[in-house]
From Swiss-Prot:
Signal peptide: none annotated. Its cofactor is pyridoxal 5'-phosphate. GO terms for molecular function: L-isoleucine-2-oxoglutarate transaminase activity; L-leucine-2-oxoglutarate transaminase activity; L-valine-2-oxoglutarate transaminase activity. The gene is ilvE. This is Branched-chain-amino-acid aminotransferase.
């Protein structure tokens, strides 16, 4: 396990690294506790906990960056707090208030300040808030007790083919990420467990990950592994898929604003047919972990589509997003939460 002294900040990858403190709050008798920081990273759970048998678990992911002045900056944490609430509602779990969510994130960052990546190192401090159903239980029903936990780890690029490395390669999969009217639009653990096999098959074929198509017709682009998709057309329009089974990415939502307001591009959120790929000169995967990863190739039904990686617009969006996240450029209202 890497320790702070031997971390190579510029080549971290995306893996678990134990840091000093995490925040834990408990839900009992109808309310959340105030929560506290603890140093122990192991949990003791009842063998009957619904999270272990029925997947009653949801989570979030957000990043803190170090600014040039040394401040810790969280990117759009209120959006993550709201999305976690939506996920909790879907699984009949008690919602975590925005206040408790922000408090937990801030305390974890302050307690693990030494793990915050240096300015412009290419790394960041990734926060993983999650809620799980615990306690003695056997039947298929909501838990009576819950844990809300936030831990953190320093991370680098999620995909190997990042913005500086020529882009990533993807292949469509016949597997479905989510069912119609299922849980695709929320961030619950079961969605990701179900994706492991498709990811394994894609990587064994030499690709970075797979692209999921819509579960009804298998003709429309949904998600790119654990990230959202966007494409740049030959006439410079920013297009991203619309579907109730796509997780609403905070990064994608932000890119739509930046593309429209800063780059003055036409922005569309609509269904994208897989056969439309030839209309794009650039394509990318976006999300908290992926940030913006340019796509250089998509394989589908023995046909291959190639894209500029990174293309000019993708690079502009990446630079603009990162400059806001690192405090170099003024951010839209409520996008940046300064800690400490």
């Amino acid at each position: 396990m890497p320790n702070l002294e031997n971390l190579d900040w510029k080549n971290l990858g995306f893996s678990y690294i134990k840091t000093d403190f995490r925040f834990i709050a408990t839900y009992k008798n109808g309310s959340w506790s105030q929560g506290e920081l603890v140093s122990e990273n192991a949990l003791q759970l009842s063998e009957g906990s619904p999270v272990l048998h029925y997947g009653q678990a949801c989570f979030e992911g957000l990043k803190a960056y170090r600014s040039q002045k040394g401040k810790a900056l969280l990117f759009r944490p209120l959006e993550n707090a709201k999305r976690l609430q939506t996920s909790c509602e879907r699984l009949l779990m008690p919602k975590v208030s925005e206040e408790l969510f922000l408090k937990a994130c801030a305390e974890v960052i302050k307690a693990n300040q030494k793990w915050l990546a240096p300015y412009k190192s290419g790394a960041s401090l990734y926060l993983r808030p999650f809620v799980i159903g615990v306690g003695d239980n056997l039947g298929v029903k909501p838990a009576s007790e819950y844990l809300f936990i936030v831990f953190c780890a320093p991370v680098g690029a999620y995909f190997k083919g990042g913005i500086e490395k020529g882009g990533a390669r993807f292949i469509t999969t016949a597997f479905d990420r989510a069912a119609p009217k299922g849980t695709g639009g929320v961030k619950v653990g079961g969605n990701y467990a179900a994706s492991l096999l498709a990811h394994k098959i894609a990587t064994e074929q030499g690709y970075d990950d797979c692209i999921y198509l819509d579960p009804t017709t298998h003709t429309k682009i949904e998600e790119v592994g654990a990230a959202n998709f966007f494409g740049i057309t030959h006439d410079d329009a920013f297009i991203t898929p619309h579907s109730p089974s796509i997780l609403p990415s905070v990064t994608r939502k932000s890119l739509m604003v930046l593309a429209k307001e800063h780059l003055k591009l036409k922005v569309e959120e609509r269904e994208i047919l897989i056969d439309e790929l030839g209309a794009f000169k650039e394509a990318g995967a976006c999300g908290t972990a992926a940030i913006i990863t340019p796509i250089k190739e998509i394989a589908h039904n023995n046909k291959s589509y190639s894209f500029e990686a990174p293309g000019n617009i993708t690079k502009q969006l990446y630079d603009l997003l990162l400059s806001i996240q690192q405090g170099e450029q003024e951010a839209p209202k409520d996008w940046i939460f300064e800690v400490g």
